[in-house]
Swiss-Prot record:
The protein, known as: Trifunctional purine biosynthetic protein adenosine-3
Source organism: Drosophila pseudoobscura pseudoobscura (Fruit fly)
One annotated GO molecular function: metal ion binding
Sequence ranges assigned to domain ATP-grasp in this UniProt record: 114-321
Binding annotation for (6R)-10-formyltetrahydrofolate: R1221, M1246, R1247, I1248, L1249, N1263, D1297, E1298, G1299, V1300, D1301
Gene name, Swiss-Prot/TrEMBL: ade3
Binding-site residues for Mn(2+), renumbered to this chain: E291, N293
Region annotation AIRS: where it falls in the sequence: 435-1154
Stated family: In the N-terminal section; belongs to the GARS family.
Record keyword ATP-binding present: yes
Record's catalysed reaction(s): 5-phospho-beta-D-ribosylamine + glycine + ATP = N(1)-(5-phospho-beta-D-ribosyl)glycinamide + ADP + phosphate + H(+); 2-formamido-N(1)-(5-O-phospho-beta-D-ribosyl)acetamidine + ATP = 5-amino-1-(5-phospho-beta-D-ribosyl)imidazole + ADP + phosphate + H(+); N(1)-(5-phospho-beta-D-ribosyl)glycinamide + (6R)-10-formyltetrahydrofolate = N(2)-formyl-N(1)-(5-phospho-beta-D-ribosyl)glycinamide + (6S)-5,6,7,8-tetrahydrofolate + H(+)
Spans annotated as GART: 1155-1364
Cross-referenced Pfam families: AIRS, AIRS_C, Formyl_trans_N, GARS_A, GARS_C, GARS_N
Annotated site residue numbers, Raises pKa of active site His: D1301
InterPro entries, per database record: ATP-grasp, ATP_grasp_subdomain_1, Formyl_transf_N, Formyl_transf_N_sf, GART, GART_AS, PreATP-grasp_dom_sf, PRibGlycinamid_synth_ATP-grasp
Length: 1364
C-alpha cells in the first residue's frame, strides 16, 4: 500500500470514485480537489481546500502532484479535461486517468464528435450543424426526417439538449440555445439531429487508447419527473445492469461503437486513456450513438462501481500504462444497483442552499449507499443542501425490482426542510415495463377464477331450482335477484321473517367424505328451522358458496342437497352466489351460508310470552343426530385421537354399514312439514326454539323473565352417538348440554292441556313444565336438568366413560360497534329481539326481491392492511345494487361472518361497516350470523356473505325486456373504482408488479391498499326517488359486477339486441389503466372482469333521457354512454365498447406524467375549492392534478380552513396592502411561480385581474361563472336571469382573458329555473352544477384534452363542450 491518488471534483460521481479507490490495498492516501463533506468521511480520503490549491490552475495541480508523489490523477468532471488538464499532467509525467484536450473533443464539441462518428462509420442519428438560427430553423422545417433534437455543441452541464415534441418546439429551442445563447458560447454552434425512437441506455468503457473494455450497461433518467417528463437534468437516477440491451446487441456495441471509436482515435493520432462513455438509443435498426462522453457518467458511476469486483486503482493504472488488455475485469453477478437522486426545490432552473437535511443513514452498508452531490454541513455538523442535485440514495439487491423499491424507500426517508426534495419514484421501472410487455397477459382465469366454470354451474343447477318452484315464484336463476309474489299466498297481514345460517365445520367432514348432498340439506334445514321460531312459512331460499377452486360437479351436489330440502319444505330455491377465492380458501376448501325468507301473519308471530302459564309443557322433537353444532372442535379432537372416520360406526347406523363419518354427517332434521300446519293454525304452539347453539342455551331463549324449567331425560332417550362422542373425547355431560342438542332438535311450548305432541308430532317427548321462578332463587340457573348424566354415563361407558373435557363456543355474538343500526318504520322486534318486517299497505301487488353476494378477495386486502372498516359497506352494496336492478326498494339486510380466530374487536369493526352500508342503503339491519371456524380459516382470515331483501310493485319490476328497443339510450353512473370484483386478478397483478399494499399507488397519492379498499358505491339513494315515480322512463338497470361490462349488460337484453358504448363519454378510472399495464391485461379481459368506470348502467327510452339526467347528472355524475342497437349476427358479442383502447392509452399516458400543479384563488367560503379537493382525491374521477397552493385575498375565510383541513399550503395576500392591481398581481405571480404552479383556478376570487397577469397565465387560468355565458356576465347574474324571465340558468367554466367573462368556454352546466325561485334557491341549485362542472373542466385541462386557448373560438365553444 504505497500509492497516493488525486481525484479532481466534488460531486456524487467523485464521492463514488473515492469510495471505490479506498477499497484498494494498493492505495494509502486519496486527495480530493476540492472534495466534499461526504468524501472527507471516506477512509483514506482528505479534501484539498480550493484556497490552498486552485482547481483551475492546472500548472499548480501538476506541481503539487509531483511534490506529493501522486501516482495517479483521476479527473471526474468534463470541463478540466476539455480545457487541457490531462495534457498538462502528461507533459509533467504524471499519469492522468482522462484524455487530453484533443480526446475530450468527443464530448466538448458535439459537431466534431458527430463528424468523427461519420468519418469512422459509427452508427448514429443523421444531423446537421449550424451557427445561424434562421438556417437551423429552415432545416428543421424542411428536413427529410424528424429533425427535432437540438443540441448545444459545447459543454452545458448535461442540460444543453432539447428533445422537442414538434417543429415549433424545436425552433423555439434554436432561438434559446443559439439565438439567446442560453448556455453561453457552448451554444454558439448548434447540432440538429434526427429524432430516434427507442430506449436510451449508457455503456461506459475503460480504455488505454489501444484496447477497450465495456462496463456493465446502465440506464440514466435525465428528465426531472416520473414518466420522463419535465425538463432535462444532469440525471435523476440510474440503475445497473440494464436488461434492456441484449447480449448480441452489447457485443455489437463493443465492435461497432467502442472499438471503432478507439481505432478512429488512433487513426487521428489522438492519445486517449480513461473512460469512453457511449450514450445509446436502442432503435429498431440496432443501437445508435446519441453522444460520447470523455469521463465517468453521473449518476451512472454511482451504480456501476459498487458492482465492480476488480480493484479500480489497478484498472485505472492499466489504462494509463497501456496494459488494459492484460487485466481481466470482474463484476458481481446476480446483483443489481439502483440509485435515486434527491434534488433541491427549483432544480434544474434554480437550486436551494442551506436547507436542513434529516433522515440520512449514519453509515453506508454493503446493500445501502449514500453519495453526496451537493451537500454541506454547518457548524453543528448538520447536513444542509448545497446545490441542485444534493445526494443519491442507492440500494443493492439480488432482485432489480427489490433494489428499486428499497432505493425509493430510502429516498423517501430523507427530507429537506422548507420546500422539500424532488426525486423520482420510477427509477428502473422501464426495465419492469419491458418485462411486463413481453410477459404473457394475465387473465381472471390465470388468477384462479374461472368465469366459465361459474356459468357452467348456473346451467347445471337451473333444473334443480325449477324443481323447487312453488306458487309465488317469478323468473329463474341468472338474473340480478330472486323474485317472489306475495299475492299468490293467502296472507292477510303478511310479515316477512328472515333467517341466516351456516353449517360450521361440518362442511369439512362432508368434503372429506363426499357427503355433499347431506351438507347442502343441512344448510337449508338450519335456515328453514330458524324461521319456525317466528311462526313463519319458509317460501324462498338463497345460498352462498365460497371455495378456493370451483369444481362444478361438487358444487352442483351441494346445491342438489339444498334443493332436496327446499322441496321437502315446499320452499323455492330462487338464487345464490358462488365465489371462487383462491387467496382466501385453499383448493378443496369451502364454506356455505344460507338465507331463508318466510311469511307469517302479523297475529301469528312467535314467541307469545304473553300467553305463557305455569304448567305449560316444554316438548322436545328428536334430532337426527348432531345436526351442525360444534364440529370444529369435534373434528379437531377426533383427528388428534387418530380416530378413522371411514371405519364402520359402532353407534347409530353402524349396524347397517354406515361409517362414523356418515353417522356424524347425518343431515339436520327438517321440521317444516311437521310443524307448519300447527303454527298456521295458531291455537296451540306458543313458542319454538331451534336447538343450534346447545340445548341449555336454546331452551333459555324460551323462558321470559320469571319462568324456569327442569328438563327431565327420564323418558327421553339420548342417541348413542352422544355417548360414543363423550367417551371417545372424554367430554363432560355439562359441555354436551351446553354445546349440543343431545338428541333434541326443536323445543316447543304447548298448553298443559295440549295433546298435540302425542297425536301429531311423532317422536315428541315432554321435557318438562314451566314454573314460576321463586323470588329468592338468586343466581340459580333457570334451566335445570335431571336424569341426563346417568343415561349418558351408560352410553359412554363402552367407549371410555365421561371425562371433564369442555367444548368451546363456535357461534358468536358480535359485540356492539357503537354504530347505530338503521331501522325502517316497517321493521319491528318480536319478544326475544328478532327483527321482522311488515309489508307496507301501499303496495297493491308486492314482489319480494332477494339478493346475495360476497366481497370476494377484496377481503384479503382488508385483512393484510388491517383496514376492515369498509368491507361491510362493499358487502351491502354488492347485494342491494343487485336487487335495485329488479326495481326493488331495499328493506332489510342480513350478514354471515366466519373467521379462523375469534377477535371480538375485528368482528365489531367489520359489522360496523355492514351497519353503515345498511344505513346508506336505507335498509334495516336484521342480524349477523357469526362463527369461529379454525378448521376452515387461517387465524387472521374471515369471509363475509350478505343477503338483501327488497320490495317492488309488480308493475315496477325491472328489466322491462319487451320494451327495450334499438335507439334506447344508455346512461352510466360512475363506479368508485374496482368495487368488489376481480380481486383475484388484482392480487396476481400486484405479485407480477412486485408491489405491496402499503406502497404508494402508481396512479394516486394514496397507498395501493387505500385505493383498492375504496368501498363499492351504493346506488340506492341515487335512484330510489326516481324509481318510485310511475313514469320514470327507466327500462332496465345493470349492476356491473362479476363478469364486467361484457357479461352484466346482456342480462337485461333480449338475444336480438346489443349495446354500443363509447369509452370517450365516461372517465376510465386510472386504477384500470394501471392494472392493464402492470398485468398486460387485454382490453377484452378487462371489460369481462371489471366495471371499467361504470358501476351501474341504465337503459332509458330516448324521450326520457333529459328527465333522468336532470335527476342524476350533477349529484351522481351520470352521463350518456351509449345506445341499444340491433344485433344482426347472433355470434357477435352483445356489448361493443368503442374507443376503449384509445381511452385506455390516454389514461396510461396521463399516468406516465407528473400531476399538474394547480393553485386555487379564493375570497370566501371555498365550496368550489372543496369540490376540486374532493374530485382530485377521488382517483376514480381521473382529475390528474394536485392543488399545491390556495391563495385568499381575505383573511379568516372558510376556504382557508378547508385548505388547512386538506393539508394544502395556503396564504393570505391582501389586495389592500398593495398600491395597484398590477403590483398585487406581480406578488401573486411570485408566489405562484415559487410553488411551480402550472394552472390556476379562480373559485370565487373577487378581484379583477390585471392585463399583464392574464396574459402571463393565458391558457392556464380558468374561472367558474354562475350563468350560461355569454348570457349575464359580471355580477348579480341570478337576479338578472330571474328578471329576464329565463327558464334556464347554470354555470360556465371558461378561460380567463382580458375581458369580463369573455374567455373561451370549457364546460357549461344548465339548471332549470322553477316557479317560485328567488335568488337564494337558484344560487343553491347552481352550486350543485358548479361542483360538477369545475372538477370536470380541470380534468380536461390537466389531461391535455383541450386545445390551446389561442386556437379556441370564443363564439363557438361547442367543440370543447362536446369533448367532455
Amino acid at each position: 500500500m504505497s500509492h497516493s491518488v488525486l481525484v479532481i471534483g466534488s460531486g456524487g460521481r467523485e464521492h463514488a470514485i473515492c469510495w471505490k479507490l479506498s477499497q484498494s490495498t494498493l492505495v494509502k492516501q486519496i486527495y480530493a480537489l476540492p472534495g466534499s463533506f461526504g468524501i472527507q468521511q471516506v477512509e483514506k480520503c482528505r479534501n484539498l481546500d480550493a484556497k490552498v490549491l486552485d482547481p483551475k490552475d492546472f500548472e499548480a495541480i501538476a506541481k503539487w502532484s509531483k511534490k506529493n508523489e501522486i501516482s495517479l490523477v483521476v479527473v471526474g468532471p468534463e470541463d478540466p479535461l476539455a480545457l487541457g488538464l490531462g495534457d498538462v499532467l502528461q507533459k509533467e509525467g504524471i499519469p492522468c486517468f482522462g484524455p487530453g484536450k484533443q480526446g475530450a473533443q468527443i464530448e466538448a464539441d458535439k459537431k466534431w464528435a458527430k463528424d468523427f462518428m461519420l468519418r469512422h462509420g459509427i452508427p448514429t442519428a443523421r444531423y446537421e450543424s449550424f451557427t445561424d438560427t434562421n438556417k437551423a430553423k429552415a432545416f428543421i422545417r424542411s428536413a427529410p426526417y424528424q429533425a427535432l433534437v437540438v443540441k448545444a455543441a459545447g459543454l452545458a452541464a448535461g442540460k444543453g439538449v432539447v428533445v422537442a415534441a414538434n417543429v415549433d418546439e424545436a425552433c423555439q429551442a434554436v432561438d434559446e440555445i443559439l439565438g439567446d445563447l442560453k448556455y453561453g458560447q457552448a451554444g454558439a454552434t448548434l447540432v440538429v439531429e434526427e429524432l430516434l425512437e427507442g430506449e436510451e441506455i449508457s455503456v461506459l468503457a475503460f480504455t488505454d487508447g489501444k484496447s477497450v473494455r465495456a462496463m456493465l450497461p446502465a440506464q440514466d433518467h435525465k428528465r426531472l419527473g416520473n414518466g420522463d417528463t419535465g425538463p432535462n437534468t444532469g440525471g435523476m437516477g440510474a440503475y445497473c445492469p440494464c436488461p434492456l440491451i441484449s447480449q448480441p446487441a452489447l457485443e455489437l456495441v463493443q465492435r461497432a461503437v467502442l472499438e471503432r471509436a478507439v481505432q478512429g482515435l488512433i487513426k487521428e493520432r489522438i492519445t486517449y486513456q480513461g473512460v469512453l462513455y457511449a450514450g445509446l438509443m436502442l432503435t429498431r435498426d440496432g443501437p445508435r450513438v446519441l453522444e460520447f462522453n470523455c469521463r465517468f457518467g453521473d449518476p451512472e458511476t454511482q451504480v456501476i462501481l459498487p458492482l465492480l469486483e476488480t480493484d479500480l486503482f489497478e484498472v485505472m493504472q492499466a489504462c494509463c500504462s497501456g496494459q488494459l488488455d492484460r487485466l481481466p475485469l470482474q463484476w458481481r453477478s446476480g446483483v443489481s444497483a439502483v440509485g435515486v437522486v434527491l434534488a433541491s426545490a427549483g432544480y434544474p432552473e434554480t437550486s436551494t442552499k442551506g436547507c436542513l437535511i434529516t433522515g440520512l443513514p449514519d453509515v453506508n452498508s454493503p446493500t445501502q449507499l449514500i453519495f453526496h452531490s451537493g451537500l454541506s454541513v454547518n457548524k453543528q455538523k448538520e447536513a444542509l443542501t448545497n446545490g441542485g442535485r444534493v445526494l443519491i440514495a442507492i440500494a443493492l439487491d439480488a432482485s432489480l425490482k427489490e433494489a428499486a423499491a428499497k432505493a425509493t424507500k430510502l429516498a423517501g426517508t430523507i427530507t429537506f426542510a422548507g420546500t422539500g426534495a424532488q426525486y423520482r419514484t420510477d427509477i428502473a421501472q422501464k426495465a419492469f415495463k419491458i418485462a411486463i410487455a413481453t410477459a404473457p397477459g394475465l387473465s381472471y382465469k390465470d388468477s384462479g377464477v374461472d368465469i366459465d366454470a361459474g356459468d357452467a354451474l348456473v346451467q347445471r343447477i337451473k333444473p334443480l331450482s325449477r324443481g323447487t318452484q312453488r306458487p309465488g315464484v317469478l323468473g329463474g336463476l341468472g338474473g340480478f335477484g330472486g323474485l317472489f309474489r306475495l299475492k299468490d299466498l293467502s296472507y292477510k297481514e303478511p310479515v316477512i321473517a328472515e333467517a341466516t345460517q351456516g353449517v360450521g365445520a361440518k362442511i369439512q367432514l362432508a368434503l372429506q367424505n363426499e357427503l355433499y348432498e347431506n351438507i347442502g340439506y343441512d344448510l337449508f334445514a338450519m335456515s328453514a328451522n330458524d324461521l319456525l321460531e317466528l311462526g313463519a312459512e319458509p317460501v324462498a331460499f338463497l345460498d352462498y358458496i365460497a371455495c378456493g377452486k370451483l369444481h362444478v360437479p361438487l358444487a352442483a351436489q351441494l346445491v342438489k342437497g339444498m334443493a332436496d330440502g327446499c322441496r321437502d319444505a315446499k320452499c323455492a330455491l330462487v338464487g345464490g352466489e358462488t365465489a371462487e377465492m383462491p387467496s382466501l380458501y385453499a383448493p378443496g376448501q369451502h364454506d356455505m351460508a344460507g338465507y331463508c325468507v318466510g311469511i307469517v301473519e302479523q297475529a301469528r308471530v312467535l314467541p307469545r310470552f304473553d300467553l305463557y302459564e305455569p304448567e305449560d309443557l316444554l316438548v322436545g322433537l328428536p334430532s337426527s343426530g348432531l345436526h351442525c353444532a360444534g364440529f370444529n372442535e369435534i373434528l379437531t379432537q377426533l383427528a388428534a385421537s387418530k380416530v378413522n372416520l371411514k371405519e364402520c360406526s359402532p353407534v347409530g347406523g353402524g349396524k347397517h354399514g354406515l361409517s362414523l363419518a356418515q353417522v356424524l354427517g347425518t343431515p339436520t332434521r327438517l321440521y317444516v312439514q311437521q310443524l307448519l300446519p300447527h303454527l298456521q293454525a295458531g291455537n296451540q304452539i306458543k313458542a319454538v326454539a331451534h336447538v343450534t347453539h346447545g340445548l341449555l342455551h336454546d331452551v333459555q331463549r324460551l323462558l321470559p323473565e320469571g319462568f324456569e324449567v327442569t328438563l327431565d331425560f327420564g323418558a327421553v332417550p339420548v342417541p348413542d352417538v352422544f355417548g360414543w362422542l363423550a367417551g371417545q373425547l372424554q367430554l363432560s355431560a355439562q359441555t354436551l348440554l351446553e354445546r349440543h342438542n343431545c338428541g333434541i332438535g326443536m323445543v316447543l311450548v304447548l298448553p298443559q292441556s295440549s295433546l298435540l305432541w302425542r297425536t301429531a308430532l311423532p317422536g315428541a317427548k315432554v321435557l318438562g313444565v314451566l314454573n314460576r321462578q321463586a323470588k329468592a332463587s338468586g343466581g340459580a340457573p333457570r334451566v335445570k336438568v335431571r336424569n341426563f348424566v346417568e343415561q349418558l354415563q351408560k352410553l359412554a361407558a363402552p367407549f371410555g366413560g365421561l371425562g371433564e373435557t369442555q367444548l368451546p363456543e363456535e357461534v358468536k355474538d358480535v359485540p356492539s360497534s357503537g354504530v347505530k343500526a338503521t331501522t325502517r318504520e316497517e321493521c319491528f322486534e318480536n319478544a326475544v329481539g328478532r327483527r321482522l318486517t311488515r309489508v307496507p299497505n301501499h303496495y297493491v301487488d308486492p314482489i319480494l326481491i332477494l339478493g346475495t353476494d360476497g366481497v370476494g378477495t377484496k377481503l384479503k386486502i382488508a385483512q393484510q392492511t388491517h383496514r376492515n372498516a369498509s368491507v361491510g359497506i362493499d358487502l351491502v352494496a354488492m347485494c342491494v345494487n343487485d336487487i335495485l336492478c329488479n326495481g326493488a326498494e331495499p328493506f332489510s339486510f342480513s350478514s354471515y361472518y366466519a373467521c379462523g380466530k375469534w377477535q371480538a374487536a375485528l368482528a365489531a369493526e367489520v359489522n360496523a361497516g355492514v351497519q353503515e352500508g345498511a344505513s346508506q342503503a336505507n335498509s334495516s339491519f336484521v342480524a349477523s350470523h357469526s362463527a369461529a371456524l379454525p378448521l376452515l380459516y387461517e387465524p387472521q382470515v374471515y369471509d363475509l356473505a350478505g343477503f338483501a331483501l327488497g320490495i317492488a310493485e309488480r308493475s315496477g319490476i325491472l328489466p322491462r325486456l319487451d320494451e327495450i328497443q334499438p335507439g334506447d339510450v344508455l346512461i352510466g353512473l360512475p363506479s368508485s373504482g374496482v368495487h368488489s370484483n376481480g380481486f383475484s386478478l388484482v392480487h396476481a397483478v400486484l405479485k407480477r408488479a412486485g408491489l405491496g399494499l402499503n406502497d404508494r399507488a402508481p396512479f394516486s397519492e394514496k397507498t395501493l391498499g387505500e385505493e383498492l379498499l375504496v368501498p363499492t358505491k351504493i346506488y340506492v339513494k341515487a335512484l330510489s326517488a326516481l324509481l318510485s315515480r310511475p313514469n320514470h322512463g327507466i327500462k332496465a338497470l345493470a349492476h356491473i359486477t362479476g363478469g364486467g361490462l361484457s357479461e352484466n349488460i346482456p342480462r337485461v337484453l333480449r338475444k336480438e339486441l346489443a349495446v354500443r358504448l363509447d369509452a370517450n363519454k365516461y372517465p376510465l378510472p386510472p386504477v384500470f389503466a394501471w392494472l392493464a399495464a402492470a398485468g398486460n391485461i387485454s382490453s377484452t379481459e378487462l371489460q369481462r372482469t371489471y366495471n371499467c368506470g361504470l358501476g351501474l348502467v341504465l337503459v332509458v327510452g330516448a324521450t326520457e333521457v333529459d328527465g333522468v339526467l336532470r335527476e342524476l347528472r350533477y349529484p351522481q355524475r351520470a352521463s350518456v354512454v351509449g345506445e341499444v342497437v340491433a344485433r344482426k349476427d347472433p355470434k357477435k358479442p352483445q356489448v361493443v365498447v368503442q374507443n376503449f383502447e384509445a381511452s385506455l392509452a390516454r389514461t396510461q399516458r396521463m399516468l406516465s406524467q407528473p400531476r399538474k400543479r394547480v393553485a386555487v384563488l379564493i375570497s370566501g367560503k371555498g365550496s368550489n375549492l372543496q369540490a376540486l379537493i374532493d374530485a382530485i382525491r377521488d382517483s376514480a374521477q381521473g382529475v390528474y392534478a394536485e392543488i399545491v397552493l390556495v391563495i385568499s385575498n381575505k383573511a379568516g375565510v372558510l376556504g382557508l380552513e378547508r385548505a388547512a383541513k386538506a393539508g394544502i399550503p395556503s396564504m393570505v395576500i391582501s389586495h389592500k396592502d398593495f398600491p395597484s392591481r398590477e403590483v398585487y398581481d406581480v406578488e401573486l405571480t411570485r408566489h405562484l411561480k415559487t410553488a411551480r404552479v402550472e394552472f390556476i383556478c379562480l373559485a370565487g376570487f373577487m378581484r379583477i385581474l390585471s392585463v399583464p397577469f392574464v396574459r402571463e397565465w393565458r391558457g392556464r387560468l380558468i374561472n367558474i361563472h354562475p350563468s350560461l355565458l355569454p348570457k349575464f356576465p359580471g355580477l348579480h347574474v341570478q337576479k338578472q336571469a330571474l328578471e329576464a324571465g329565463e327558464t334556464e340558468s347554470g354555470c360556465t367554466v371558461h378561460y380567463v382573458d382580458e375581458g369580463v367573462d369573455t374567455g373561451a368556454i370549457i364546460v357549461q352546466a344548465a339548471v332549470p329555473i322553477l316557479p317560485g325561485d328567488d335568488e337564494e334557491t337558484l344560487t343553491q341549485r347552481i352550486h350543485y352544477a358548479e361542483h360538477w362542472a369545475f372538477p370536470r373542466a380541470l380534468a380536461l385541462l390537466a389531461s391535455g384534452a383541450l386545445r390551446r386557448v389561442s386556437e379556441v373560438k370564443k363564439e363557438a365553444p361547442k367543440d370543447i363542450k362536446d369533448s367532455q
